[in-house]
């Protein structure tokens, strides 16, 4: 929502995810985003993992605005590094036999619920990182079940600049016998 500004303003992404998860805010940004989504005004579907990191960073109060590309995910990673015990979170995985899709909406809902119960921000940040890593590894496992010659994985894109995520995904995939390149 909002073109380039939407990619910078993590709060906008958060409002979009929360609206889609059925959590409706009453502040002006949430109302504007909900109306834009409902009426399909200046909205583009994003499959960017970076935008999800932006939304979670805003949700946890870590970073609400990207002054430079990747700022919110970097700050979220820094927060996660403080964790001693990751909060257990996971993606809902939708697999129809042709495509595998990670549905982050239950994850967003669970983070909101955990925050309302006093969960520690750094533990939620680390839990989010672990959930993303688990989703990537599980996707690869499912793809290999469809084609047992699938044993090499290339990790690329800005999200894999995240050291926590990269190290965990490599660890999980190598433990499952994949050759991993990054």
Predicted feature locations:
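Beta-strand segments within the central parallel beta-sheet cores of soluble alpha/beta enzyme folds
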Residues: 1, 70, 152-155
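Phosphate/diphosphate-binding loops
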Residues: 1-21, 35, 182
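Glycine- and other small-residue-rich loops at beta-strand/loop junctions that grip anionic moieties
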Residues: 3, 125, 129, 158
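A contiguous, well-structured pocket-lining segment that forms one wall/lid of small-molecule binding clefts
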Residues: 21-27, 31-150, 164-178
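Glycine-rich beta-strand-to-loop/alpha-helix junction loops that act as flexible
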Residues: 49, 153-160
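Short beta-strands and strand-loop turn motifs
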Residues: 150-156, 181-182
